[in-house]
Amino acid sequence: MSVISIVPLVSKPCLYKSFISSTHEPKALRRPISTVGLCRRAKSVTASMSMSSSTALSDDGVQRRIGNHHSNLWDDNFIQSLSSPYGASSYAERAERLIGEVKEIFNRISMANGELVSHVDDLLQHLSMVDNVERLGIDRHFQTEIKVSLDYVYSYWSEKGIGPGRDIVCADLNTTALGFRVLRLHGYTVFPDVFEQFKDQMGRIACSANQTERQISSILNLFRASLIAFPWEKVMEEAEIFSTAYLKEALQTIPVSSLSREIQYVLDYRWHSDLPRLETRTYIDILRENATNETLDMKTEKLLELAKVEFNIFNSLQQNELKCVSRWWKESGSPDLTFIRHRQVEFYTLVSGIDMEPKRSTFRINFVKICHFVTILDDMYDTFGTMDELRLFTAAVKRWDKSATECLPEYMKGVYIDLYETVNELAREAYKSQGRDTLNYARQALEDYLGSYLKEAEWISTGYIPTFEEYLENGKVSSAHRIATLQPILMLDVPFPPHVLQEIDFPSKFNDLAGSILRLRGDTRCYQNDRARGEEASCISCYMKDNPGSTEKEALNHINGMIEKRIKELNWELLKPDKNVPISSKKHAFNISRGLHHFYKYRDGYTVANSETRNLVIKTVLEPVPM
């Protein structure tokens, strides 16, 4: 039976206090959000414009635009009925035992004469262990062991790459490609010139006509390596083109298997739109299939056993956190705002998909809160609010005082108070982690965000289509990447002194790229529906205005090229050598970008959350993996 078809049980008490301080318990608004939204009587809603958009008469007698978004998919009663046996101490004890056994495996392959060590493939063993624990989502337990392994591999790295073992003189493509990727992601300096030697006289990667599993795996690792290229690395661009074509052809010829499923997954999600938890779930399923076919070695079997236990332990925590998110949403009065998209479960799925560290509940819970308000503001500025109302709300946020509600229409008052209290609450939480007041950062980000939205609302009301440059400059901010990232990361157990924050927040290159990628990718997925709602300005329409005679297809091709270029630039911003701003300080902001990108893989996965996004919720949050 599908998990979605289960009849919800009686609501259970929130278990939030069992894993986080009671001071963080979600609480209801002091004043529930006003029910002045759409009239609940069906006869009061008069459709017009198009199937994807309509106008409706609100309770205050104003004809308003609405988006006709589908309703919340996840009833609170259903969420409160979720239960999992994997929170029991016996599973934690089992995980600790397995962690010790995996550490022992790491130690044995690090011994010069260890029983598992062969000088013929020791480098590949180290790299495979690191790659496996990371893909299986259990690497947090083995940071010391990972560094020892990578230091060892790097000591044998040369300008010609490496072979599978330290005694192998000739480099091979598989080990070199895997090593390049893993080493670069961990901050080691490696150059793509190592791949030049694998080219034939025609300048193409040399490979035999026979598509053996070993050769296919080598090209798969080459493809994975090509995804973390920097903008100027021509050889990596060539490697990506070649490996993409090779793997697509291989899928047409090899039988359906765990290898074909792995190839399809990597081709589909690449790296910048991949969610770590979805990758973990997928890789667990692939290894489970190999285990059934008795093709796993002893080391990988042990890793798989630990990964399944860890996945399900975190799954239990996810469900507890999700209950609190749903309770907060319900008690806040948000369900009465019938003109907005209710996507709190989807936001939680995103954030728990990029951070599986159990102790970071505060980060995950508050990310959902911020994104929930982003959605309210998005729908308010895009459709429901009148221009006069939106100007009043924007001015009230600049005042940042509860008394500012006096000048607001009734339905905005509750939104403003809840936004005010939540942003202040998150700033107090951030103070505990950062040891300084960060409220001004948050307020400035919010003001900039609403300013960009007010400008877009003005464009909608007047039918104005700006130049592409003007549109994108504003769209970097209205994409909401900055506001969704800034306050949540400040609640992590990671220090963000001013010199580090300025490399991630506005106006840094990192922030600029992440915001523009999200805006460009979002528009390619949303522009047709937005246009049907009367929102003419998009990166597609602006490009076509700037380039008379161009077609939508040409505009999309140009924009997709811009996205790919910016992705490589963002790779550099994340991975560039910088002793003052380590990769670890930028990783969460980068992963938020990956998560947001993921939801636009096939469509606007927030607005239309009843297809791929629904399946993602089930696969990564609601269902455990079979033990």
From Swiss-Prot:
Cofactor entry: Mg(2+); Mn(2+)
Enzyme class: lyase
Alphabetized InterPro entries for the sequence: Isoprenoid_synthase_dom_sf (IPR008949), Terpene_cyclase-like_1_C (IPR034741), Terpene_cyclase_plant_C1 (IPR044814), Terpene_synth_N (IPR001906), Terpene_synth_N_sf (IPR036965), Terpene_synthase-like (IPR050148), Terpene_synthase_metal-bd (IPR005630), Terpenoid_cyclase/PrenylTrfase (IPR008930)
Molecular function in Gene Ontology: lyase activity; magnesium ion binding; terpene synthase activity
Listed SUPFAM superfamilies: Terpenoid cyclases/Protein prenyltransferases (SSF48239), Terpenoid synthases (SSF48576)
Main location: plastid
Residues bound to Mg(2+) 1: 378, 382
Gene Ontology CC terms: chloroplast
GO biological process: diterpenoid biosynthetic process; green leaf volatile biosynthetic process; monoterpenoid biosynthetic process
Positions annotated to bind Mg(2+) 2: 378, 382
Documented EC number(s): 4.2.3.107
Span of the transit peptide along the chain: 1-46
Cofactor note: Binds 3 Mg(2+) or Mn(2+) ions per subunit.
Pathway note: Terpene metabolism; oleoresin biosynthesis
Subcellular location: Plastid, Chloroplast
Keyword Magnesium: yes
Keywords: Chloroplast, Lyase, Magnesium, Metal-binding, Plastid, Transit peptide
Reactions this protein catalyses: (2E)-geranyl diphosphate = (+)-car-3-ene + diphosphate
Motif range (DDXXD motif): 378-382
Residue positions binding Mg(2+) 3: 530
Function, in words: Terpene synthase (TPS) involved in the biosynthesis of monoterpene natural products included in conifer oleoresin secretions and volatile emissions; these compounds contribute to biotic and abiotic stress defense against herbivores and pathogens. Catalyzes the conversion of (2E)-geranyl diphosphate (GPP) to (+)-car-3-ene.
Domain remark from Swiss-Prot or TrEMBL: The Asp-Asp-Xaa-Xaa-Asp/Glu (DDXXD/E) motif is important for the catalytic activity, presumably through binding to Mg(2+).
PANTHER family assigned: OS04G0344100 PROTEIN-RELATED
Record-stated family: Belongs to the terpene synthase family. Tpsd subfamily.
Name recorded for this polypeptide: (+)-3-carene synthase 1, chloroplastic
Organism: Picea engelmannii x Picea glauca
Gene that this sequence comes from: TPS-3car1
